[in-house]
């Protein structure tokens, strides 16, 4: 099924690209989310008329994401206290939700889906740098300090 993308989508294309995708992906994800329209003559004309508006919306989203990334990078070390053993091994782990909640408590709104932990949850005390993907093109680094709870 051919669709016209209304947004930048990772591993697929940018705004205005006409791409071929599987019918289920288009019907179940792209079309309901408003990220694409079926590529036909009528939709192509409508898209060309709205192209400037959509590009302005993407630029505004990017500007907001860049501003949020600057706020996240400006944060001092975010401290998370958790119960730990004598050698600094945590009883449990610190995951995406815990990090997102701590950053939100520090004053910058952050969703758990934006936190990237490629090596999995944190299981020891110490200093960590956690990557946060605020937008498809914008990333930030959170300085995280995991300390043992009294």
UniProtKB/Swiss-Prot annotation:
Question: Entry's PROSITE patterns?
Answer: RIBOSOMAL_L9
What are the record's GO terms for cellular component?
ribonucleoprotein complex; ribosome
**Keyword annotations of the record:** Ribonucleoprotein, Ribosomal protein, RNA-binding, rRNA-binding
Keyword Ubl conjugation listed? The answer is no
Highest taxon in the source lineage: Bacteria
InterPro entries hit by this protein: Ribosomal_bL9 (IPR000244), Ribosomal_bL9/RNase_H1_N (IPR009027), Ribosomal_bL9_bac/chp (IPR020594), Ribosomal_bL9_C (IPR020069), Ribosomal_bL9_C_sf (IPR036791), Ribosomal_bL9_N (IPR020070), Ribosomal_bL9_N_sf (IPR036935)
Q: Does the keyword Transferase apply?
A: no
Q: Which GO terms describe its molecular function?
A: rRNA binding; structural constituent of ribosome
Q: Give any single GO term for biological process.
A: translation
Q: What NCBIfam families does this protein map onto?
A: L9 (TIGR00158)
Q: Which family does it belong to?
A: Belongs to the bacterial ribosomal protein bL9 family.
Q: What does the record give as the function of this protein?
A: Binds to the 23S rRNA.
Protein name (database record): Large ribosomal subunit protein bL9
- Whose protein is this, by species? Shewanella woodyi (strain ATCC 51908 / MS32)
Source organism phylogeny? Bacteria, Pseudomonadati, Pseudomonadota, Gammaproteobacteria, Alteromonadales
């Amino acid at each position: 099924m051919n669709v016209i993308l209304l947004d930048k989508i990772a591993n697929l294309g940018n705004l205005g690209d006409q791409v071929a995708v599987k019918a289920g992906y288009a019907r179940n994800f792209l079309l309901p989310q408003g990220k694409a329209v079926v590529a036909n003559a009528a939709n192509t004309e409508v898209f060309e008329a709205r192209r400037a508006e959509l590009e302005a919306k993407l630029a505004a989203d990017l500007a907001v994401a860049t501003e949020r990334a600057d706020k996240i990078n400006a944060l001092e070390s975010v401290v998370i206290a958790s119960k730990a053993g004598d050698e600094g091994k945590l009883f449990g782990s610190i995951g995406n939700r815990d990090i997102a909640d701590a950053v939100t408590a520090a004053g910058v709104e952050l969703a758990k889906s934006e936190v990237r932990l490629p090596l999995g949850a944190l299981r020891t005390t110490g200093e960590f740098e956690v990557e946060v993907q605020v937008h498809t093109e914008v990333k930030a680094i959170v300085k995280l300090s995991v300390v043992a709870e009294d």
